[in-house]
Curated annotation (Swiss-Prot):
NAD(+) binds at Y127, Q188, N211. Catalyzes the sequential NAD-dependent oxidations of L-histidinol to L-histidinaldehyde and then to L-histidine. This is Histidinol dehydrogenase 1. Belongs to the histidinol dehydrogenase family. Binds 1 zinc ion per subunit. Keywords: Amino-acid biosynthesis, Histidine biosynthesis, Metal-binding, NAD, Oxidoreductase, Zinc. SUPFAM superfamilies: ALDH-like. The lineage of its organism: Bacteria, Bacillati, Cyanobacteriota, Cyanophyceae, Nostocales. It catalyses: L-histidinol + 2 NAD(+) + H2O = L-histidine + 2 NADH + 3 H(+). The active site is at E324, H325. One of its GO terms (cellular component) is cytosol. Its cofactor is Zn(2+). NCBIfam families: hisD. One of its GO terms (molecular function) is histidinol dehydrogenase activity.
Length: 431
C-alpha cells in the first residue's frame, strides 16, 4: 500500500507511477482466445459443448435453459432476496427510463427537411460471469437498459460450473425480462453470441463483464458485433476530510478491494492523522473479513493513500486518475463534483457509500475502468440505441443548395457525385 504526500519532493514521479499502474492480466491470452473463437465459428454447438465440458466440467444435452428450470431455480430465492431484486429493478428502470431521447426533425431556411431517429438494436447478448463474480445485480444493470431501449431479443449466457448456478442470477433475469438464457461461459460464449451456432442465433451487440479470456474475446469479435467496453479491475477513489468516521471510509475502500486482487482503492484526504486512522481501520477489518485474501492482496499491492494540502488539490489528481467510482465524503460535495471531468460515477456526501450504486441507487454500475473515464461513460440506454439521420429535398430546396454540392464534388475529383446532382438540376431547368 502506497502513502503519498503532495508536499514531498518525490511526489510527482511517484504519483505518475500510480497513474500508470497497469493492473490488467499480464498473461497473453490472445492466441488461446483466437483458437476458441475459430473453433466455435467453424463447428458451432459441438465446439461449445467441448469447451464447456473441459472448462466447466458440465455437459448438458442442451445449453438452452428452459422456462421451467429457470422458474424452479428462481423459486429457491428467499422472499427477502426477491423483494430486493424487485426494488433494485424498479429504481434502475426509473433512472434509465428518463434517459430515453427524443427524435429530431425540422425544416431549414433552404426548405430541406432534416432529422434524426433513434432506433433500438434488434438483439443483444449479455455475458454474466460465474464463479466469484456471479452477480445478479449485473444482470439487472445490463438487461434493464436494453429492455427500456426497446431491444426485442435479450440473450444471456452464464456458465454453470459442475452444473450449478446462483439462483438469484436467474431470478434477476426473470425480473429484467431476459428472453433467452444459455449455460455457456468464457470465450466460447462470446463466440456463440457473435457468430451463432446451430441453436443460438447471433446477436448485434455483446455487453457484460468477464475474465481476461472474455475481455479478449470481446476485443476480437468487435466489428462482427458491437461491444460495450473492455472491463478492467474495479476502482474506487474516496475524497474524505477529517470529519468522517474512519471505519466507514475503510469499509468503502475494501468494498472494491474485495472484488479482485487487481482492484484499486485510493483515499485522498487533507488530514494525515485521519489517513492513519483509516489505514488502521482497514487493517483491523481485514483480520475478520471473509474476503480477506482477495481484499488484502488488492490493498497491499494496489491501494494508495494521498495526503493533500487542501481538498481543492485533490481535483487535478482525481482527474488524472480518472477512476471508476468516486466518493466525495465532504461537507460540500457538489462544489468538488462540479470540477470533476474524468470519473465513471460520483457518490456525494457521507451517507452515499458506493455499494448503494452497485445494487439499487439507479445509475448503472457498469462503468469505465483503467482510466478510460477520460473518454468513456457508463452503460446506459444509449448503448442499445442507434441514430439514423435523414434528409429530404424538394425541387426548390435542391435548386438552392445543389450547385454548391456540384462544386465541392468537382473539387474532390468525384465526377459521379457531381453528376448525380447536376443531372437533377438540369432536369429542373428543362421542365
Amino acid at each position: 500500500m502506497l502513502v503519498l504526500k503532495t508536499t514531498d519532493k518525490e511526489f510527482s514521479p511517484r504519483f505518475q507511477s500510480l497513474v500508470s499502474d497497469r493492473r490488467e492480466a499480464t498473461v497473453d491470452v490472445s492466441g488461446t482466445v483466437r483458437d476458441i473463437l475459430a473453433h466455435v465459428k467453424a463447428r458451432g454447438d459441438a465446439a461449445v459443448q467441448e469447451y464447456t465440458s473441459r472448462f466447466d466440467h458440465y455437459r448438458p444435452h442442451s445449453h438452452h435453459l428452459s422456462a421451467a428450470f429457470i422458474a424452479e431455480q428462481a423459486a429457491k430465492c428467499s422472499d427477502e432476496v426477491k423483494a430486493a431484486l424487485e426494488l433494485a429493478a424498479e429504481r434502475i428502470s426509473s433512472f434509465h427510463q428518463k434517459q430515453l431521447p427524443q427524435d429530431i426533425g425540422y425544416t431549414d431556411t433552404a426548405g430541406v427537411k432534416l432529422g434524426l431517429n433513434w432506433v433500438a438494436l434488434s438483439q443483444v447478448g449479455i455475458y454474466v460471469p460465474g464463479g466469484r463474480a456471479s452477480y445478479p445485480s449485473s444482470v439487472l444493470m445490463n438487461a434493464l437498459p436494453a429492455k427500456i431501449a426497446g431491444v426485442e431479443r435479450i440473450v444471456m449466457t452464464v456458465p454453470m460450473p459442475h452444473g450449478e448456478i446462483n439462483p438469484a442470477v436467474l431470478a434477476a433475469a426473470q425480473v429484467a425480462g431476459v428472453t433467452e438464457i444459455y449455460s455457456i461461459g468464457g470465450a466460447q460464449a462470446v463466440g456463440a453470441l457473435a457468430y451463432g451456432t446451430e441453436t443460438i442465433t447471433p446477436v448485434d451487440k455483446i455487453v457484460g463483464p468477464g475474465n481476461a479470456y472474455v475481455a479478449e474475446a470481446k476485443r476480437q469479435v468487435f466489428g462482427t458485433v458491437g461491444i460495450d467496453s473492455i472491463a478492467g479491475p474495479s476502482e474506487i477513489l474516496v475524497v474524505a476530510d477529517r470529519q468522517n468516521n474512519p471505519e466507514w471510509i475503510a469499509w468503502d475502500l475494501l468494498s472494491q478491494a474485495e472484488h479482485d486482487p487487481s482492484a484499486q482503492s485510493i483515499l485522498i484526504t487533507d488530514s494525515e492523522s485521519f489517513a492513519q486512522q483509516v489505514i488502521a481501520a482497514v487493517e483491523q477489518i481485514l483480520t475478520t473479513l471473509p474476503s480477506q485474501k482477495v481484499a488484502s492482496s488488492s490493498w497491499q499491492n494496489h491501494g494508495a493513500v494521498i495526503i493533500v494540502r487542501d481538498l481543492a488539490e485533490s481535483i487535478p489528481l482525481l482527474n488524472q486518475l480518472a477512476p471508476e467510482h468516486v466518493e466525495l465524503c465532504v461537507d460540500n460535495p457538489q462544489l468538488l463534483a462540479s470540477q470533476i471531468k474524468c470519473a465513471g460515477s460520483l457518490f456525494l456526501g457521507r451517507y452515499t457509500p458506493e455499494a448503494i450504486g452497485d445494487y439499487l441507487g439507479g445509475p448503472n454500475h457498469v462503468l469505465p475502468t483503467s482510466r478510460s473515464a477520460r473518454f468513456a461513460s457508463g452503460l446506459s440506454v444509449y448503448d442499445f440505441l442507434k441514430r439514423i439521420t435523414y434528409l429530404e429535398c424538394n425541387q426548390a430546396a435542391l435548386q438552392k443548395i445543389g450547385q454548391s454540392a456540384v462544386t465541392l464534388a468537382e473539387t474532390e475529383g468525384l465526377p459521379a457525385h457531381a453528376g448525380s446532382v447536376a443531372v437533377r438540376l438540369q432536369g429542373l431547368k428543362d421542365m
